[in-house]
A protein has these predicted regions:
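Short intrinsically disordered terminal tails
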Residues: 1-3, 74, 85-88
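A short beta-strand micro-motif
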Residues: 5-9
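Acidic, low-complexity, intrinsically disordered interaction modules
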Residues: 11-73
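Ubiquitous "structural anchor" signal
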Residues: 20-21, 29, 80-81, 87-88
Length: 88
């Protein structure tokens, strides 16, 4: 699965997935506004947004890259490109 994932935040608009996270929570960033990062948990019919600091989001994305490299994941290039676009 190499598709991009987007969510609509009720206040900040479109968010895009930056990295899968831990415990069923993924990391998303604002698409149009000043960069804000969210830890997002999706349950049956509810979505929970938690604002997180830039460095926490970057750390989680780096951990995801390391994990993808160890596994030899087919999606490694996708995550590397997203990391560069978002954090560098």
């Amino acid at each position: 699965m190499s598709s991009e994932r987007y969510l609509n935040h009720p206040t900040f608009g479109m968010l895009y997935q930056v990295s899968p996270g831990n415990d069923g929570r993924d990391i998303y960033a604002t698409l149009y506004a000043q960069k804000m990062f969210f830890s997002v948990e999706i349950r049956q019919r509810e979505v929970f947004f938690e604002v997180i600091p830039y460095l926490d989001a970057r750390n989680q994305a780096e951990l995801n890259l390391q994990k993808a490299r160890r596994k030899g994941s087919e999606e490694l290039s996708k995550w590397e490109n997203l990391f560069k676009q978002t954090f560098l």
